[in-house]
Structure formats: C-alpha cells, structure tokens
Amino acid sequence: MRALAVVAMVATAFLAAAVHAEQCGSQAGGAVCPNCLCCSQFGWCGSTSDYCGAGCQSQCSAAGCGGGGPTPPSGSGGSGVASIVSRSLFDQMLLHRNDAACPASNFYTYDAFVAAASAFPGFAAAGGDADTNKREVAAFLAQTSHETTGGWATAPDGPYAWGYCFKEENGGAAGPDYCQQSAQWPCAAGKKYYGRGPIQLSYNFNYGPAGQAIGADLLGDPDLVASDATVSFDTAFWFWMTPQSPKPSCHAVATGQWTPSADDQAAGRVPGYGVITNIINGGLECGHGEDDRVADRIGFYKRYCDILGVSYDANLDCYSQRPFGS
C-alpha cells in the first residue's frame, strides 16, 4: 500500500460527507444487519417488504440468512468470474474507486476485470466448490484493494470501501527506477519499474515475465500497466497465478492446493489468507507481531467475504510467520 501519503488530501475532500447513519450494505462499508434482518437498498435494517423486497442488498430471506452470511446479489448470468461478481456487485465492492478524489477514477472497469480474468481460466474455478471460488475472488480483490487503497479510519462508508483508488505508486515517477541488473530482463533506457496496477507490480524482474506471459512489452513500455486497464488487471492476475520459488502462487493457497513443507511449518506458514500476505509483502509485514498493514488486508477480505456471502477461512494473519526465504 503505497498511496497513504495522499490520504490526508482525500480525507479533507470528504470530511463533510463523513457522518453517515446508514446501517448496512454499500452505504455502510458492506456491513450486514444483525439478527438476520434485511438490508434495504438505502442501507437500513428491517424485516418488512420495504427492506426485504426490491433493491434489498443482503439477507433478503430467512434461507439466505440461515447460511451464516448475506445473500449476495444475483450474478450477471455469465461464466467464470462474471458468474460470481456481477457489474453491480463489482461497483458495490469497489465502492469509491471512481470517486473524483481518487487518481485512478474511471480507470479500473468491470469489463477490464472480467476480460483479464478470462485470460487466466484457473482463477476462481475450483471445480464444484462455489465457496472456494468466492473466497479466492474476495482474497484477490482484498489484497489488491490494500495495495491501491485511498481509505482512512473515518472515511465515508468505512476504510474498506476505498480500494482501487490508485493506479500508480504515489511519487513513483520521481522515485528510484526499481531496476536490478538482469541479462534476462534488461531495463529499458529511461524507464522506471515502480508500482503500477492493482498489485502494484514493481521491478524489471516482474515487469519482464509478466509482459511475456500476457504478450505485451512491459520492459519497453511499463506505463501500459497504468494506461490500459485490461493490461493492468492482467499483470495482477499473472502475479496471483504464478509461483515464484520458494513461494507458492497466491492462487494455490487460496484454492487449498498448497501443502506446506516441513520448513514452511517450522516457519509458521500454514494454509490461509495470511500466507497470501506473506507471498506479497512478507519481508516487510510478517513475522514481527501485529502490523496495521496486515490488519488492513484482513479488513478488506472480511468485507468482501461478507458481501459474497461466504465465511472466512482460518489463519488470516501472518503475525507469527517468518517471511519466505528468511
């Protein structure tokens, strides 16, 4: 999460809007009503048709509540990730991504998300296990939301409604070039490989193989990751799906395909969302007790799981995990 330096600016812009009385749904950061009450289209909890009828956001029937979570809005009727996340649900999850105060306003589109996901057919496609697929979507959007967040503790609709606010590392153009000498992935003259896109792809040794995988010259034109939304999502899905030894892929962990080795177990690395955080930024965030950045990643994950109507898995943090390779 490299965008926090701008949080004060965003907070000031919306201070007048920070007082909200709504109780649930998109108006309350994806919150779910207590006691199985319905969440109306306007963000209020109740049990009459005004709350449970047209526009109801979650727990719209007793059956939906009985499953231990909200009833997610119906999908788009498409296939793959589109069958899990409809356009309206995407807008609810990334509620403020197109806010005028966000530098990435109107960049990250639903169509680009679906198009990029379709290029990685294994994503959210665990055969016959709908809940696992939903959790993988929640985990992907949570980790990338943390990397691009514009939220703060008292932000309108809560801190976890501000994912995808940024598309470039704050100050990246004026910073270091993130180039490590490599014969395989040589840096182009005058180019910088700072964080861009949903996963904040960094360094030439990531831009090179990501570009090779998706068919784009990202070493020669790294700015594509911040100018073409589909390419931007492509790089995030590439990172998510690709193992980089000794790390497993985020996808393998999210879908239960990763079995920790004896060394992993000795390092406290056990299956769960926390290992995904370790894969992405464990060297800075994991293994030294509680960390606000890890907690932020968990907050996004819980919100998205709630919206998708699935329970959280175990081992959400990496506070006691040693980073990979340490």
Curated annotation (Swiss-Prot):
InterPro entries per UniProt: Chitin-bd_1, Chitin-binding_1_CS, Endochitinase-like_sf, Glyco_hydro_19, Glyco_hydro_19_cat, Lysozyme-like_dom_sf
Keyword annotations from UniProtKB, A to Z: Carbohydrate metabolism, Chitin degradation, Chitin-binding, Disulfide bond, Glycosidase, Hydrolase, Plant defense, Polysaccharide degradation, Signal
Disulfide bonds: 24-39, 33-45, 36-65, 38-52, 56-60, 102-165, 179-187, 286-318
EC assignment: 3.2.1.14
Any one GO molecular-function label of the UniProt entry: beta-N-acetylglucosaminidase activity
SUPFAM superfamilies: Lysozyme-like (SSF53955), Plant lectins/antimicrobial peptides (SSF57016)
Signal peptide segment: 1-21
Ranges that cross the membrane: none
Tissue specificity note: Expressed in meristems and at lower levels in roots and sheaths.
Ranges for domain Chitin-binding type-1: 22-62
Taxonomic superkingdom: Eukaryota
Active site (catalytic residues): 147 (proton donor)
Catalytic activity: Random endo-hydrolysis of N-acetyl-beta-D-glucosaminide (1->4)-beta-linkages in chitin and chitodextrins
Keyword Signal: yes
Short name of any one Pfam family annotated for the protein: Chitin_bind_1
Gene Ontology biological process terms in this record: amino sugar metabolic process; cell wall macromolecule catabolic process; chitin catabolic process; defense response to fungus; polysaccharide catabolic process
Role this protein plays: Hydrolyzes chitin and plays a role in defense against fungal pathogens containing chitin. Its overexpression confers enhanced resistance to sheath blight pathogen (R.solani).
Similarity comment: family membership: Belongs to the glycosyl hydrolase 19 family. Chitinase class I subfamily.
Name under which the protein is recorded: Chitinase 12
Gene name for this UniProt entry: Cht12
